[in-house]
């Protein structure tokens, strides 16, 4: 069965310069190779990475740039050697579309840490082409980087799992944050933070949301089911949390202090950093004297991604989303910068290009 875009034009929206303004764009996807899967994109989540690269914040953007790495859709064609997928399957594609497949990390299903991994957009693939992401009608990927979405799990809800979901799930599993009865602190309540709360509750943890904004209290407790809420600037509230948490997931964007949060951990506690502040300053005593750890993490490997999707389907865990059409994307990206979304924008791709 031929793919909708095939070797012809693929409709998309792209940024042409560091203004980050996106507009309609056409380009050619590669032909399906023997180990490739081609999918019609139905939905694509909107991540802050889309802002960073469309606006050249990291000074490495390659224009025209088609963003989007939270992709969900339906298989339209498979290569001759593909055994894991068939036409009609619901699938997802995440933050990377290639890796060396031969290093220690790849052989351990940690492809996200492969030194040669290729980003889903604004990356350079092995054939020298610049990758283009999910703000488009169609994508072709090697089957290793494609993931099954169980029938019945809404594709619009599945899309954010491919970045926001796995970015939280992977460090939680690596640090055994799935022990019922333990306590979890979640710093920040955006796209990643709200997924950390959902996973924490599903794991049977006592979840405390820590935010700079009192306005997040109702969302945290009434909407997401957190057990506790603390405003980080309130010294009295923070004092009551000292040495009470087994784990902390830090999703806060931008620069922020670390010592006040590390003191909230029990002896042997772990704080996982998921964001990219410009620097990290920590007093050694807050680590050494409590046997505490500060750990970094970025997305997740292929094994974890499929496991996470299956876990969400089995436990009816769904991201909270605001659905938009592609022609609203410039407003949505600015709203994301302004932190005006609850909790993830998802583009209705299949109804945006008709």
Swiss-Prot record:
The keyword Kinase does not apply. SMART domains: PKS_ER. Keywords: Lignin biosynthesis, Metal-binding, NADP, Oxidoreductase, Zinc. It comes from the Eukaryota. It catalyses: (E)-cinnamyl alcohol + NADP(+) = (E)-cinnamaldehyde + NADPH + H(+); (E)-coniferol + NADP(+) = (E)-coniferaldehyde + NADPH + H(+); (E)-sinapyl alcohol + NADP(+) = (E)-sinapaldehyde + NADPH + H(+); (E)-4-coumaroyl alcohol + NADP(+) = (E)-4-coumaraldehyde + NADPH + H(+). Transmembrane segments: none annotated. Zn(2+) 2 binds at residues 100, 103, 106, 114. It holds the Pfam family ADH_zinc_N. Pathway: Aromatic compound metabolism; phenylpropanoid biosynthesis. It is an enzyme of class 1 (oxidoreductase). Zn(2+) 1 binds at residues 47, 69-70, 163. GO terms for biological process: lignin biosynthetic process. The keyword Oxidoreductase applies. Its cofactor is Zn(2+). Binds 2 Zn(2+) ions per subunit. InterPro entries: ADH-like_C, ADH-like_N, ADH_Zn_CS, CAD-like, GroES-like_sf, NAD(P)-bd_dom_sf, PKS_ER. Its EC number is 1.1.1.195. NADP(+) binds at residues 167, 188-193, 211-216, 251, 297-299. Involved in lignin biosynthesis. Catalyzes the final step specific for the production of lignin monomers. Catalyzes the NADPH-dependent reduction of coniferaldehyde, 5-hydroxyconiferaldehyde, sinapaldehyde, 4-coumaraldehyde and caffeyl aldehyde to their respective alcohols. Belongs to the zinc-containing alcohol dehydrogenase family. Homodimer. This is Probable cinnamyl alcohol dehydrogenase 1. The gene is CAD1.
